[in-house]
């Protein structure tokens, strides 16, 4: 059951040209990728609306439960997430010529703390630069990165002008990275 992993939230990060003459302001790099071969490792079955516009849910029915909740092959999702988030992080650093000395904060997608810890370990990311918030909010899917940045901004750690490297992973499989100045 994956439901214990999920939280509810929304967020956005608006990235644009910087206010200064420094060409390093704003968004420096983005990359997104997809591989549909992982679709059946993390998915939500959808009912056929053409047969019935209303879903009648029976909480005692295993068949109904499979149609209402996300399904996941955890080991495969974990391995793909770690591998692709590491690849996306490497690519971001290589394409920009930046190193961990240049990056103020690493903000991975908050799907699972073990995934984040593995990405940090394999990428040799300085642990004090890695920010997590899953312990407070759960996996809020697309909102995890903005919520994490906002959480640590309110705590006083993340500040305007900080350089952030973010890497993400999602169903299907999809993954990507971005480097931007806050």
Question: Where does each model-flagged region fall?
Answer:
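Condensing-enzyme catalytic core mediating Claisen C-C bond formation in acyl metabolism
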Residues: 1-79, 83, 87, 182
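Short, surface-exposed connector motifs at secondary-structure boundaries
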Residues: 97-102
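Claisen-condensing/thiolase-fold acyl-transfer catalytic domains that form or cleave C-C bonds
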Residues: 82, 86-87, 93, 104-182
């Amino acid at each position: 059951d994956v439901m214990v992993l999920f939280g509810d939230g929304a967020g956005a990060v608006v990235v644009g040209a910087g206010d200064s003459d420094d060409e390093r302001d704003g968004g420096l790099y983005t990359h997104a990728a997809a591989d549909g071969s992982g679709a059946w490792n993390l998915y939500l079955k959808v009912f056929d609306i053409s047969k019935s516009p209303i879903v009648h849910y029976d909480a005692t029915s295993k068949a109904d439960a499979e149609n209402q909740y996300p399904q996941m092959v955890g080991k495969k999702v974990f391995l793909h997430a770690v591998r692709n988030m590491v690849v996306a992080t490497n690519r971001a650093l290589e394409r920009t010529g930046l190193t961990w000395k240049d990056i103020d904060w690493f903000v991975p997608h908050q799907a699972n703390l073990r995934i984040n810890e593995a990405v940090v370990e394999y990428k040799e990311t300085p642990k004090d630069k890695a920010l997590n918030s899953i312990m407070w909010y759960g996996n809020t899917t697309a909102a995890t990165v903005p919520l994490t940045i906002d959480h640590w901004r309110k705590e006083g750690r993340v500040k305007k002008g900080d350089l952030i490297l973010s890497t993400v992973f999602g169903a299907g499989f999809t993954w990507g990275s971005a480097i931007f100045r806050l």
